[in-house]
Amino acid sequence: MKKILGFLFIVCSLGLSATVHGETTNSQQLLSNNINTELINHNSNAILSSTEGSTTDSINLGAQSPAVKSTTRTELDVTGAAKTLLQTSAVQKEMKVSLQETQVSSEFSKRDSVTNKEAVPVSKDELLEQSEVVVSTSSIQKNKILDNKKKRANFVTSSPLIKEKPSNSKDASGVIDNSASPLSYRKAKEVVSLRQPLKNQKVEAQPLLISNSSEKKASVYTNSHDFWDYQWDMKYVTNNGESYALYQPSKKISVGIIDSGIMEEHPDLSNSLGNYFKNLVPKGGFDNEEPDETGNPSDIVDKMGHGTEVAGQITANGNILGVAPGITVNIYRVFGENLSKSEWVARAIRRAADDGNKVINISAGQYLMISGSYDDGTNDYQEYLNYKSAINYATAKGSIVVAALGNDSLNIQDNQTMINFLKRFRSIKVPGKVVDAPSVFEDVIAVGGIDGYGNISDFSNIGADAIYAPAGTTANFKKYGQDKFVSQGYYLKDWLFTTANTGWYQYVYGNSFATPKVSGALALVVDKYGIKNPNQLKRFLLMNSPEVNGNRVLNIVDLLNGKNKAFSLDTDKGQDDAINHKSMENLKESRDTMKQEQDKEIQRNTNNNFSIKNDFHNISKEVISVDYNINQKMANNRNSRGAVSVRSQEILPVTGDGEDFLPALGIVCISILGILKRKTKN
C-alpha cells in the first residue's frame, strides 16, 4: 500500500510541475509577443512619419505616431518594411521559446520539482538590443528611398554636392593635376543658409553614378545638382547636359579669370581654384577713390561680386553647374568696387599667360577712340597699343583671350553709330575710329549674347566674327513692366542663375556671362584635343559652331564631336554646310523644347500667381526700380574716358544677402515653384 501511495504522489507532483511550466512558458511567449508587437508598431509609425517630411534622425521607440494612409508607392515600401519586422520578430520569438525550454529542462533535471521555480523572462531592453540591427537597416533603406524622392530644387533643405579634392600634383606650368584621380563628390551634411555662406562643411563620400547611355549619363549627372532646373542657359549650350556625358575635364588645363576676384569659400567653386592668385589693383584703387584698397598683391576678395558670378559660369560644380565643372581657374583681380584701368588689365593678361593659362577670360571692356581727338587734343590710341601688346604676348605664349562685347546694343562695325554713342559721355572735337576693346583684336574671340530662343540679346553689341552664347534679355522686363515681370516669373527664363559672393546664388544678365561659357568650352577643347595654337583654336571654334539667324552660336556638344575638323583648315564649304545644318537642327530642337517649357511655366505661374502676396510685388518693384536706375546712372561712369567696366547687370535677386532681406524674393519664388512641382507630381 505504501508503494502504491508513493507512486501516486510522484505522478501528482509531475502533473503539477508540468502545469506550472506550461503557464510560465505561455506567459513568457505572451510577453515576447507584446514586446515585438510594440516594436513593430513603433518602427512602422516612425517610418510612416518620415514620409510626411519628418526630420527625425533615429526611430523613437518611446512614443507612437498615428498611421498615415496613402495610395503612393511609399505605402507599399513601408508595408514591406513592416512585414520584414514581423518575420524577424517571429524568428526571435521562436529563438526565445527554444532558449527558455532549454533553461527549464536543465533546471528540471537538477531538481525533482520546479513548483517553486519561476522562469526569468528576457527583458525588453535585451530584446530591443537584439533587434537593433534589423531596425537600423530598415531605417537606412527607407531613408534612402525617401531621400531619392525629395525635390532637388528645395532651397530650404537642399544639400550641395561638393567635388572631392583628390591628391594634387603640379605639372611643368604649375597647374594642379588631379587627372589621375577618379571623379567623386561629397555631399554636405549642413544646409546652405540664406544668410550665411557655407564654411568648413563636414562631408561624407557620395559615389558618382555611371550609365552606359549618354542620355542617361547626362540625366544622372545633372540630377545630382540641385538647381540645374533653373539653368536654362547651361541646358542650351550643353544640349540638356549631353556635353557633360561626352567629356569631363581634367586638371591639366586652366582658365585665367581677369575680373574682380572670387569668393574662395563658395562651395561650388572652392575645389576648382588653381595655384595662381594676383591682385593688380594698386593702393587707393581707381583714381585713388577706393580707400579700402591696400595694394596687397595676394588680395583677391571679391567686393563687387562680378568675378564670382563669372567663375560660376565656367567651373561651378555643386548646386549649379558651369560649362566645364571643376576645371581649374586662376584669379587675376583688376577691379575693386567699381572700375578698372587698361594698364591693369594689360598686366593681368601678361601675368595670366606667364602662369600657363591656355584660356584667358575678360568679361569687361571699354570704348576707345583711336584716331581723331577729344577737346584736349588727345585720343585713346596709347591704351589701344597697351591692349595689343599684351594680347600679342599672350598669343605668342600659347594663350587665347576671350573678351565680352559691350551691352549697349551697338553694331561695332558702324563707326558713326559708335561715335554718336560716345558723344553722350565724352566731348569729341574731331571724330575718329571707335573700337570696342579688347574684343576688337583679331587674335581675341569676341563674345556677344543671345536669349533662350537664339535671338541676339536686346542689349548685346554685334560684330563680325563674333560668337554668341546665352546672356539673357531685358525684352520682357521692358515690355511688361517691373511688377508683371516678377509676379509672372519672366526673370526665371530671361536672366541667368549663377554663383554670388554671398556664398549663395544670384540672377544676372549681360555679355559678361556669355563670355565665360565660351572660355570654358575652349578649355574643354584644349583639354580633349590638345590644340595649342590659339589661331587654330579660334578657327576650330568658329568652324564647329552652328549658325542661327546668321550668327555663330556656341554649342559644346558640336565642339566635343568636332575632332575630325581639328586640323582641317581647308575644309570645303559643303562639309561646313552639312555640319551646320545638323547643328542647327539640334539647336532648333533645344530652343523649341525650351520655349514649350517656358510657355507652360509662365501659364502655371499666371494661374498660381506664385501665392505671393501683393506686398511682395510692391517690394520687388521697388528693388528693381532702384537697382535699374542705379545701373543706368553707372553707365555714365562706365563709359567715361579711361575707365574699364564689367559688362553685366545684377538686378534681381541678390540671394543670401545678410544685410537686406528684400532681394531674397527670388528664393521665395523658386521655393514656391518647388512646392508646386512636388504637389503636381504627387
Swiss-Prot record:
InterPro entries named among the record's database cross-references: Lanit_process, LPXTG_anchor, Peptidase_S8/S53_dom, Peptidase_S8/S53_dom_sf, Peptidase_S8_Asp-AS, Peptidase_S8_His-AS, Peptidase_S8_subtilisin-like, Peptidase_S8_subtilisin-rel
Membrane topology: Peptidoglycan-anchor
Pfam families tied to this protein: Peptidase_S8
Enzyme Commission number, as recorded: 3.4.21.-
Motif window: LPXTG sorting signal: 652-656
Pathway: Antibiotic biosynthesis; nisin biosynthesis
First-tier enzyme category under EC: hydrolase
GO CC annotations, alphabetized: extracellular region
Any one Gene Ontology molecular-function term assigned to this protein's record: serine-type endopeptidase activity
Peptidase S8 domain span: 231-566
Keyword annotations of the record: Cell wall, Hydrolase, Peptidoglycan-anchor, Protease, Secreted, Serine protease, Signal, Zymogen
Family as reported in the entry's similarity comment: Belongs to the peptidase S8 family.
Function in brief: Cleaves the lantibiotic nisin precursor peptide.
Protein name from the UniProt record: Nisin leader peptide-processing serine protease NisP
Record organism: Lactococcus lactis subsp. lactis (Streptococcus lactis)
